[in-house]
Amino acid sequence: MQIINWASLLLVTWETVVAAELPIVDLGYQRHQAIGFNSTGRYYQFSNVRYAEPPLGPLRFSLPVSPRNRSHEVVNGKGLGNICPQSQACWFNVQGDFVSAVTAGSTFNFTAAYDQVYQQDECTKPRPVADQNPLESEDCLFLDVYVPEKVISKRRDGNGKSNPGAPVLVYFQDGAYVSGSKSDQNPSGLIATSREDGSTGIIYVGVNYRLGVFGWLSGQKFQSEGGLPNAGLYDERLALEWVQRHITKFGGDPSRVTVMGVSAGGGSITMQLTAYGRAIRPPFAQIIAQSPAWEPGTKTPAIEDDLLDSFLTLLNVSSLEEARRLPSQALLDANYELVASRPYGSGVFGPAIDGSFVPDSPKRLLLERKVDPSVRILTSYTANEGFMLAPANVTDDATFNRYVDVLLRGANASVRAHTSRVLYPPIFNGSWPYHSQHERANLLWSEVSTTCNTRYLHQAVATPGYAIEYAVKPAMHLSDTSSVFYNGQGSSSSLNATIAQLMQRQIVQFVKTGNPNVKGDPHVPLYHGQAHVLSLGDNGVRVEPALTNTDRCTYWQQVEF
């Protein structure tokens, strides 16, 4: 086995290569040249490859359209690098202070933290221009392709015939459907791990998709005015179809595509699996769904219409058609302000039932197995998913019940009462898996929004899959991302280099073979029957029962809300 020199990956070394020597790929609509060669990782990077027309003007809030213009000009993506417009709910700032205090063993004054963020009314004011990332642009539907040197060189043999292609890993980023970009993660560690066995390695594709109001507005009123719900899902789908059409030109195998994502990225992958209720075969063979997140109880018709009305009010217009004609900066500002001002503890955007791409609740589609049964699945979740997302002000029954009302806004009074009294009762004597009101809210968010979703995925497909639990403390939502993309850097308490390298080997092995098990490493069990997972923690690696093997998960999949 080839040994990775992780210290060398600390330095991002881009070798100076004469432009004429960098590979060029003819995509039909443009000729795209690699922007550089990483001499440490031995891979080429093709940056900012356009996969859709700019979603501006009449294409705002509409289907993404494949590039129309044909050009023989060679481009390399330099000077583009746009990211989709970003935003974040202000209450996340309070939660960040809470997490920092608790993990440091300090006391946390919620009122003081809340007042500091909210009392000065910063969350309802327009964002200062200086705070905006200059790369933010509606023209953001680009992707990056990272290709190992040997994959490029072996695209064709000496007789001009195509060689068997390399496996492909497509990544959708996290960000609560309102932030993030294809550039958030550095895949150099994964690529290096994929070459440990002496093979050519894997191709990595990072994708931008529309966020916030640009990608996730929905509802009857929005549709009646010509808006397309779930535009972000259609962006992702077009990118996956782009991979199917073009990845052979980079040396990849379109029949060996794995889609990976965490949080919103994992939730998006779930929607891609259930898309159209199995009416159309998915453009991928495997998924790696990490903490697949969506909040099914937060999308009611009234909430959807209220979001649209609030957005139009911020723009000082009365219709979506008028919004389409406004300058881009006006929409960027309104998007930011709308998300920032959302009520404490509430989600804002995400997938919605639209009768087409999302024909029904994904949990119900999975229950009815309306998916391609041949798709192979690897899932993961963290042991403490809801720690940073359950509101810090849940300290008694009254605040817990208010949180239930926020999280399950689409549920009726009976479901909410059952949640508080039966599913998550205020019992803290050790007989339930929580010892405080915040831990109670933590478990509620975890099961409703992420962990139970992994169980639904496994039960929907024909072939038993695999599951991993990330238990390195604090093991909260997203804390495993630094391990997945470990490249020799990082010294935080949430990163264990041994665990990180193990996770990377498991991921790469799954991408290559559909099985995450590597000879000599701890065995990842099949997820079936009693549902066991491989738990990766500070105190060792062991097989344990899945946190999802509960009656509560069964209830959440079957109840209407």
From Swiss-Prot:
Its main location: cytoplasm. GO terms for cellular component: cytosol. It catalyses: a carboxylic ester + H2O = an alcohol + a carboxylate + H(+). Substrate binds at residue 263. Induction: Expression is correlated with the production of patulin. Expression is positively regulated by the secondary metabolism regulator laeA. Expression is strongly decreased with increased sucrose concentrations. This decrease is lost in the presence of malic acid. Expression is increased with pH changes from 2.5 to 3.5 in the presence of a limiting concentration of sucrose, 50 mM. Natural phenols present in apple fruits such as chlorogenic acid or the flavonoid epicatechin modulate patulin biosynthesis. The active site is at 263 (acyl-ester intermediate), 385 (charge relay system). Pathway: Mycotoxin biosynthesis; patulin biosynthesis. GO terms for biological process: antibiotic biosynthetic process; monocarboxylic acid biosynthetic process. It is found in: Cytoplasm, Cytosol. Its EC number is 3.1.1.1. Disruption phenotype: Strongly reduces the production of patulin. Patulin was originally used as an antibiotic and specifically trialed to be used against the common cold, but it is no longer used for that purpose since it has been shown to induce immunological, neurological and gastrointestinal effects. Genotoxic effects of patulin with dose-dependent increase in DNA strand breaks in brain, liver and kidneys have been detected in mice. However, more recently, it has been proposed that patulin might also have anti-tumor properties. It is an enzyme of class 3 (hydrolase). Residues 1-19 form the signal peptide. Keywords: Cytoplasm, Glycoprotein, Hydrolase, Signal. Glycans are attached at residues 38, 69, 109, 316, 393, 412, 429, 496. One of its GO terms (molecular function) is carboxylesterase activity. Carboxylesterase; part of the gene cluster that mediates the biosynthesis of patulin, an acetate-derived tetraketide mycotoxin produced by several fungal species that shows antimicrobial properties against several bacteria. The function of patB in patulin synthesis has still to be characterized. The pathway begins with the synthesis of 6-methylsalicylic acid by the polyketide synthase (PKS) patK via condensation of acetate and malonate units. Belongs to the type-B carboxylesterase/lipase family. This is Carboxylesterase patB. It comes from Penicillium expansum (Blue mold rot fungus). The lineage of its organism: Eukaryota, Fungi, Dikarya, Ascomycota, Pezizomycotina.
